[in-house]
Amino acid sequence: MVFSMWTRKRQILIFLNMLLVSRVFGFRWFPKTLPCEVKVNIPEAHVIVDCTDKHLTEIPEGIPTNTTNLTLTINHIPSISPDSFRRLNHLEEIDLRCNCVPVLLGSKANVCTKRLQIRPGSFSGLSDLKALYLDGNQLLEIPQDLPSSLHLLSLEANNIFSITKENLTELVNIETLYLGQNCYYRNPCNVSYSIEKDAFLVMRNLKVLSLKDNNVTAVPTTLPPNLLELYLYNNIIKKIQENDFNNLNELQVLDLSGNCPRCYNVPYPCTPCENNSPLQIHDNAFNSLTELKVLRLHSNSLQHVPPTWFKNMRNLQELDLSQNYLAREIEEAKFLHFLPNLVELDFSFNYELQVYHASITLPHSLSSLENLKILRVKGYVFKELKNSSLSVLHKLPRLEVLDLGTNFIKIADLNIFKHFENLKLIDLSVNKISPSEESREVGFCPNAQTSVDRHGPQVLEALHYFRYDEYARSCRFKNKEPPSFLPLNADCHIYGQTLDLSRNNIFFIKPSDFQHLSFLKCLNLSGNTIGQTLNGSELWPLRELRYLDFSNNRLDLLYSTAFEELQSLEVLDLSSNSHYFQAEGITHMLNFTKKLRLLDKLMMNDNDISTSASRTMESDSLRILEFRGNHLDVLWRAGDNRYLDFFKNLFNLEVLDISRNSLNSLPPEVFEGMPPNLKNLSLAKNGLKSFFWDRLQLLKHLEILDLSHNQLTKVPERLANCSKSLTTLILKHNQIRQLTKYFLEDALQLRYLDISSNKIQVIQKTSFPENVLNNLEMLVLHHNRFLCNCDAVWFVWWVNHTDVTIPYLATDVTCVGPGAHKGQSVISLDLYTCELDLTNLILFSVSISSVLFLMVVMTTSHLFFWDMWYIYYFWKAKIKGYQHLQSMESCYDAFIVYDTKNSAVTEWVLQELVAKLEDPREKHFNLCLEERDWLPGQPVLENLSQSIQLSKKTVFVMTQKYAKTESFKMAFYLSHQRLLDEKVDVIILIFLEKPLQKSKFLQLRKRLCRSSVLEWPANPQAHPYFWQCLKNALTTDNHVAYSQMFKETV
């Protein structure tokens, strides 16, 4: 434990150092050409590489070697081999889902016919691998040679039809195994799904096993005793035997749903058991499940629930009995007495066919469930909801959610909920509740009698219950087996106690309906037909209401006092109330917001508002206004100045969304009428063809401007001259062809720029100053029409070196031309294919001239060298006269020149070379050494010159490194000078390393005088021959050893 904690801390430090170094030195630790997103999760010490849906046909190069999580889902990778992850030794999770999805499950536009091939040992070298997802690849068998570190293996939606002991023997350390969806109607196997007896017994560490959607006919025998979760739903199991779960004492989750299903009205192929018989469960089948917490028996055609099933389930917390035939059983439910710790209970969609109950009868046994928090009874189908129906729930102090949706309730006295102030959600959605003036004492009641069969299909709206596999994992998300669903409008629910009356037949509301519901914080009335004229009195009992969803109704805003009774209201949704706004001659007062002192957010989307009796909206508190899908083009029509200040008196407004208002152009005067504190302005999807950029100066606090999905063709000359506060500019999906010369000059505050999906061909350097670009956090460029010519070289260079995040850089920022570069990624262009400026042209001309000059000189030298040489020296002698060169008498046989700083070379010279050549027992040579024979205090150059002059030969002991030093070059030049002055060749070269193959001098030297170029042999047996060659070279004049061809030429 201590070691693992230390390792984790060390990994975090490594990540921090890696990020710090990349920032300081300005380089990336993965290539820009990598077509994946790379993220670092420092607390978890994870490097996450996501290559989802990148059209890959192989695992890309450049994946960081320290990657821990690699996602390659939704691609077309045909095969995996041991080399696929060769350098990725730190991988902990690999997600290879959906690279060859089965035909009926996959896209019809790209049918995969060749299954993913996984070669043996492909994953065996990944010693840290913990999770492997291989779903949706048409695999025929479980991969072999998996690493022992693997804890999770997912093989869903493949073609694995047979489970045997043999193919599970390597999975002894697996804790989670998903084998579902390998044999069902959307992935048919056409054979019987077989599981060998006791096949899973070898997997002693197995905790989660899923065999869902497989046409399994019986519970597998002898499952591992440590199993915690078992999913067997949507199979064809007809019987649960007494001993099926005998040894599963630790099991916590059991799902047997969809075995012998109730098939009435389901939207998928469904085959019930014979005569609609239920799943037969032995009375003692669950006796061993003492630790069970979740039991799902959804859609098992159950008609009776014996109490004996639950006699040992004292810890059960969630029980799902939905979509069975338990309408009568629900009235008694004696089995609930055995479940004192139950937290969630679902009785939904147990209605009897052709039966419409007068009211609902809940069992008295419910009162024993003191810990119950969630009760769902959708689809019971009854007419009236009254106090006596719910009286049994008064004794449940912890009850938080009561779901009575989709019950065709016609009469509902909402005031019965005054006894349930602890409820957080009361769901009466998708019913037939409607008001009646004649029955005020009841509250809501019917306006017509309707048969239940006529509306039966409405049950399908509850998709949670009528999906074949509600827990199925998609290709994009690997999370599965989620907890129970949340309310549809989660935004409303978070404010507190919620009453959901959405999608009913309510067309009139009055205070008495909510008289005792003052505790409500959120009220959802969306999807009704409320068309009354609100005057500010209808909802006065709801003094604490903070969220009101009034969308999808027929709101008539005749009075400016509408909703004024809701003084605590913070969020108001009036979207999709276009009925009266589309009619002619109706008065609309949109200044009702003035009296809502705490209103923070107002949604008035998709109302087709084109007229208003009030010239302005007013509010001191409103911060967010959504006004999408209206007709500001009519209110701001040219020549009509009445509504130019329509939003001006929203003094606290920060976010204004006026997208989809058909604004082909925006009147310049509108900017003067904008709210003074506006920070976020959205004008998307308006069809704007022009925009008065200079008017942005009037919006002093504007930070975000969204002009996406319009028809703009131009950007401002200088964005900084238009706005000093703008940090985010979104211009995607327009018709912009070019950026102005100084577009971003001085726009240092900009952090996010999106110019994707335009028609930009060239980005000039002056348009994107580097100091501005380096301040950006996000630059979105994909789907433009870049011309990758010489004008783009600077941009390509910047893109390759910047740390700014550019989404889809490797895949979608591509060239449309010239032809050779069409479709090529911008970052992969060769920066050296273009001449940048006149300087390069001049340099090119000079270099060509130099080459031509050298060619002429060399040719002339080759043909007329000796003639020119003779003429030159003849006339030189004529003019200066002849002088005899004085030469000093030699004191040494050889001067040894070597790298005195290299200890290995020094050792070789002193112990090998000196020892051999100055050995008195053999022919004795007098050598001159720098460290031994030079005069102390005398200048180095003078010592060097004297040593060369006083020696018959100069021996250079060569290494690759020493050949590049200045001391070598100086000694060599002085030795070579003797050849020019005295016509004496004194140079001998000894190479201790492999000689420079490309050296022209060395090649020429070998041609002229091969005996003066020696190599120290690696074979010790060749050493005597080397010493003999060296002694011969020291005693022989180099001129004598010159090549015969050279002598004849001379």
Curated annotation (Swiss-Prot):
The gene is Tlr7. Gene3D superfamilies: Ribonuclease Inhibitor, Toll/interleukin-1 receptor homology (TIR) domain. Homodimer. Interacts with MYD88 via their respective TIR domains. Interacts with UNC93B1. Interacts with SMPDL3B. It is a single-pass type I membrane protein. Keywords: Cytoplasmic vesicle, Endoplasmic reticulum, Endosome, Glycoprotein, Immunity, Inflammatory response, Innate immunity, Leucine-rich repeat, Lysosome, Membrane, Receptor, Repeat, Signal, Transmembrane, Transmembrane helix. The keyword Transmembrane applies. InterPro entries: Cys-rich_flank_reg_C (IPR000483), Leu-rich_rpt (IPR001611), Leu-rich_rpt_typical-subtyp (IPR003591), LRR_12 (IPR041283), LRR_dom_sf (IPR032675), TIR_dom (IPR000157), Toll_tir_struct_dom_sf (IPR035897). One of its GO terms (biological process) is defense response to virus. Glycans are attached at residues 66, 69, 167, 190, 215, 387, 524, 535, 591, 680, 721, 800. Its main location: membrane. Residues 1-26 form the signal peptide. The chain crosses the membrane at residues 838-858. GO terms for molecular function: double-stranded RNA binding; single-stranded RNA binding; siRNA binding. The lineage of its organism: Eukaryota, Metazoa, Chordata, Craniata, Vertebrata. This is Toll-like receptor 7.
